[in-house]
Regions:
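Charged docking surfaces used in two-component/phosphorelay signaling
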Residues: 15-23
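Helix N-cap/capping motif at the beta->alpha junctions
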Residues: 30-39, 60
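Short amphipathic alpha-helix used as the core "switch/output" element in two-component signaling
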Residues: 39, 61-74, 93
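Active-site beta3 strand of CheY-like receiver
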Residues: 44-50
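Active-site residues of response regulator receiver
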Residues: 52, 80
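Receiver (REC) domain active-site loop signature in two-component systems and cognate sites
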Residues: 55
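Alpha4 helix (beta4-alpha4-beta5 surface) of REC/receiver domains from two-component response regulators
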Residues: 62, 83-105, 118
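A Lys-centered signature of the CheY-like receiver
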Residues: 109
């Protein structure tokens, strides 16, 4: 059963993701912010992390950078409702920034449950392939 860490300050988002993933045979740990996510990461081996970009206190970008530094082999999915730069706007492309900081994939809120599951399965498959390649090299 894959272990997923969900880090988001919105309890409704966390609950929806948790319920959906548990119904699909994932073990889910929810953290309500970056600090709580780091504490969870220290005590548990996760197969994947899902992290919101915009959170109070420890910002999502800071969380993504630190999570990636501490656990570089764990796939990290960044999510945000304020994610894409509009061609007519000078706003930054936050999801691209998350990828540059170490996120494996990005999801723009709102996303469908199927989109979430697809991204998770792709990340887990890629991580398993990398692990298998490393083991075969030894």
């Amino acid at each position: 059963m894959p272990r997923v860490l969900v880090v988001d300050d919105d309890p409704m988002v966390c609950m929806a993701i948790e319920i959906y993933l548990e119904r699909h045979s994932f073990h889910v740990t929810v953290a309500d912010g970056g600090e709580a996510g780091l504490r969870a990461l220290e005590g548990t081996a996760f197969d994947l992390m899902i992290v919101d970009i915009f959170m109070p206190h420890m910002r999502g970008f800071e969380s993504i950078r630190i999570f990636h530094e501490r656990a570089p082999t764990i796939p990290l999915v960044a999510m945000s409702g304020y994610a894409f730069a509009n061609l007519d706007s000078p706003a930054p492309d936050f999801l691209r920034m998350a990828l540059e900081l170490g996120a494996t994939r990005c999801l723009r809120k709102p996303f469908t449950p199927l989109a979430l599951l697809t991204v998770i399965n792709e990340c887990l498959t890629e991580a398993q392939s990398r692990f298998t390649s490393v083991v075969q090299l030894r």
